Amino acid sequence: MGMRMMFTVFLLVVLATTVVSFTSDRASDGGNAAASDLIALTIKGCCSRPPCALSNPDYCG
């Protein structure tokens, strides 16, 4: 393989790695935010109070 071809393959690998890393990072951001909200509501005791639990059914189940 020539140097130009090896360099092109290297650039493609770097680009593919960057794209996969970027999209997987963005996908996990939503999960992290939801977990943080659930922890905050639980710590504050929201789920034990009926009005709060009714306004947050996604978190209090």
Curated annotation (Swiss-Prot):
**Main localization, broad class:** secreted
Query: Care to name a GO molecular-function term for this sequence?
Result: toxin activity
Keyword Signal on entry: yes
Which tissues is this protein detected in according to the database? Answer: Expressed by the venom duct.
Residue numbers of Cysteine amide PTMs: C60
Enumerate the subcellular locations listed in this protein's record, separating them with semicolons. Answer: Secreted
Between which residues do disulfide bridges form?
A: C46-C52, C47-C60
Has the keyword Signal been applied to this entry?
yes
Q: Supply the alphabetized keyword list.
A: Acetylcholine receptor inhibiting toxin, Amidation, Disulfide bond, Ion channel impairing toxin, Neurotoxin, Postsynaptic neurotoxin, Secreted, Signal, Sulfation, Toxin
The entry's propeptide annotation covers 22-44
Q: Which residues form the signal peptide?
A: 1-21
PROSITE patterns listed in its UniProt record: ALPHA_CONOTOXIN
Q: Region (Ser-Xaa-Pro motif, crucial for potent interaction with nAChR) spans which residues? A: 48-50
> Cross-referenced InterPro entries, in alphabetical order?
Conotoxin_a-typ, Conotoxin_a-typ_CS
Extract one GO cellular component term from the record. Answer: host cell postsynaptic membrane
Q: Where is this site: Direct interaction with nAChR alpha-7 subunit?
A: L54
Q: Which domain of life is it from?
A: Eukaryota
Its family remark reads: Belongs to the conotoxin A superfamily.
Entry function: Alpha-conotoxins act on postsynaptic membranes, they bind to the nicotinic acetylcholine receptors (nAChR) and thus inhibit them. This toxin blocks mammalian nAChRs (alpha-7 > alpha-3/beta-2).
What is said about the domains?
A: The cysteine framework is I (CC-C-C). Alpha4/7 pattern.
Name of the protein: Alpha-conotoxin-like PnMGMR-02
